[in-house]
UniProtKB/Swiss-Prot annotation:
Cofactor(s) recorded in Swiss-Prot or TrEMBL: [Ni-Fe-S] cluster
Sample GO molecular function, one term: acetyltransferase activity
A family per Pfam: ACS_CODH_B_C
Database matches in InterPro entries: ACS_CODH_B_C, CO_DH/Ac-CoA_synth_bsu, CO_DH/Ac-CoA_synth_bsu_3_sf, CO_DH/Ac-CoA_synth_bsu_arc, Prismane-like_sf
Reaction(s) this enzyme catalyzes, per UniProt: Co(I)-[corrinoid Fe-S protein] + acetyl-CoA + H(+) = methyl-Co(III)-[corrinoid Fe-S protein] + CO + CoA
Protein name as it appears in the record: Acetyl-CoA decarbonylase/synthase complex subunit beta 2
Keywords: Acyltransferase, Iron, Iron-sulfur, Metal-binding, Nickel, Transferase
Subunit structure: Monomer. The ACDS complex is made up of alpha, epsilon, beta, gamma and delta chains with a probable stoichiometry of (alpha(2)epsilon(2))(4)-beta(8)-(gamma(1)delta(1))(8) (Potential).
Biological process annotations from GO: acetyl-CoA metabolic process
Family: Belongs to the CdhC family.
E.C. number(s) listed in UniProt: 2.3.1.169
Cited function: Part of a complex that catalyzes the reversible cleavage of acetyl-CoA, allowing autotrophic growth from CO(2). The alpha-epsilon complex generates CO from CO(2), while the beta subunit (this protein) combines the CO with CoA and a methyl group to form acetyl-CoA. The methyl group, which is incorporated into acetyl-CoA, is transferred to the beta subunit by a corrinoid iron-sulfur protein (the gamma-delta complex).
HAMAP family listed in its UniProt record: CdhC
Length: 469
């Protein structure tokens, strides 16, 4: 596409993954820090500037702080377009051969592979590509400056300023709700990585990447009608609490190639929305307490279930619809409709301390101290104890379930006594079942409700009787 860029640039490179062994350097990401930002200014100068080390000055295999700030100017540009334009950085960087871009805002994660580095790719080339693609895709951008920062202290300094801008954008949509509008928006920008994912954006549910709210999406659909963000007619409200709309289902069905038939906007248990991989946080169901934990991308520890964020991410990313798991933005946690189909904040039992503090104002005051963090509990057993001690709403259900199980167990024992001598139903399975050897019998007790016991015994084959001569 560009003669002065040493690698190919275009949509054919979208979806390319850069694995660890193929990586030359990593920029920002979970083991470092960084951000991306677009700002509308009065007068840009069409310059590309690098502050800090370029790629060839970095150690191979290293992880480095990174920031990219794009300043655009034009007579028809408005500040409301910043978030929309900013999200396109994801697309433009993935156009570059050997560059993998994931996530958004202050969660950005970039890898550059060895082949592209060896071909001569440097940060100045990346800056030029971003600059040219912005001007080519959006003719109303007259001038575009791109500043790439790798100096650690400078990245930290600018990161705090960027976060203030992100928060300011998110505040704008608070007065608008789903019942106030007739149109929602969809985004398929991540389908190069998650082919069946359709992100549904409403006034009460920002994009799960956290980079696009309802007003951003509306602006994006207007300035680029054929782009990845489009209108979704709301249609008939089939279930207000769960957030089921006929128009949403129709569009999701079409855009997911028929893979997803129906979605609920505000439930993690019943037909949740699909997730790509750019989500800021994951809601996950904890069956032992009939409640939810939420882990954000920056959390490096383990959840009470004994697994980290990275493992949870693998459960629901890639455009899958997985009941019990759903990717969300942190802004959605501040929405009045947050998981309302599942009980909202009363169903949340665990958060990392950092995330809990970050959304403190959104958590009902009477629940704040009843939600555990990694400092309070390490296991589900400890979580159960914590919830009971604190009087969390979920603790009532835990007690009720235990009592119900005890009653059922007594009833079963009484029934078994009454019909003493009856043969317990058994099931002989094929030898290949679950990797078991042949000749194994599995006996299920009380299997009408659940499997209370599994007894594995070796079944000796009957000896063949010798025929009399």
């Amino acid at each position: 596409m560009f003669d002065d860029i040493p690698v190919s640039v275009g949509p054919m490179n979208e979806g390319e993954r850069v694995r660890g062994p193929d990586m030359y350097v990593e920029l920002a990401g979970p083991k470092s820090y960084g951000f991306e930002l677009v700002k509308v200014v009065n007068k840009a100068e069409d310059k590309v500037e690098i502050i800090g080390k370029d790629i060839d000055e970095m150690e191979e295999g290293s992880r480095n702080p990174f920031a990219i700030i794009v300043e655009v100017s034009g007579s028809n540009l408005e500040e409301d377009l910043e978030g929309v334009l900013e999200r396109r950085i994801h697309e433009f960087l993935n156009y570059i051969e050997g560059v993998m871009h994931l996530n958004q805002r202050d969660q950005v994660w970039i890898r550059i592979n060895k082949d592209s580095f060896n071909k001569g790719l440097r940060l100045k080339h990346i800056g030029k590509v971003v600059q040219r693609l912005f001007k080519a895709e959006f003719p109303f951008i007259e001038k575009c400056d791109v500043t790439i920062i790798t100096d650690p202290e400078k990245v930290k300094e600018e990161l705090e300023k960027a976060r203030e801008i992100y928060n300011k954008r998110d505040e704008k949509t608070k007065a608008l709700h789903e019942e106030d509008v007739d149109v929602f928006y969809g985004c398929v920008m991540c389908q190069s990585f998650a082919p069946t994912h359709v992100c549904v954006i409403t006034p009460d549910r920002p994009a799960l990447c956290g980079g696009i709210n309802y007003l951003d999406a509306r602006a994006a659909a207007k300035i680029d009608p054929n782009g990845p963000i489009f209108e979704i007619p709301k249609g008939e409200c089939l279930d207000e609490k769960l957030g089921i709309y006929s128009g949403v289902n129709e569009v999701v069905r079409e855009r997911s190639q028929g893979t997803v038939e129906e979605v609920t906007l505000h439930s993690a248990l019943e037909k949740p929305c699909t997730s790509c991989g750019c989500f800021e946080a994951i809601v996950f169901y904890i069956p032992e307490v009939d409640g939810f934990g939420i882990a954000h991308r920056g959390y490096k520890g383990e959840t009470p279930m004994g697994i980290p964020f990275s493992t949870l991410a693998g459960q629901c990313s890639g455009g899958k619809q997985v009941p019990g798991f759903v990717g969300i933005s942190i802004s959605y946690m501040k929405s009045p409709k947050f998981l309302q189909g599942d009980g909202g904040w009363e169903r949340v039992v665990w958060l990392p301390k950092e995330l809990k503090e970050r959304v403190k104002d959104a958590i009902p005051e009477e629940l704040y101290d009843k939600i555990a963090t990694e400092e309070d509990v390490k296991t589900t057993d400890e979580l159960i104890k914590f919830l009971k001690e604190k009087g969390h709403p979920c603790a009532e259900r835990i007690g009720a379930e235990v009592e119900e199980e005890a009653i059922e167990e007594e009833e079963v024992e009484e029934e078994m006594e009454e019909v003493e001598g009856i043969e317990v139903p058994t099931m002989t399975l094929p030898g290949t079942f679950a990797g078991l050897p042949p000749g194994i019998k599995i006996v299920l007790y009380n299997a009408v409700i659940k499997a209370e016991k599994i007894i594995i015994t070796k079944e000796e084959p009957e000896k063949k009787k010798k025929k009399k001569k």
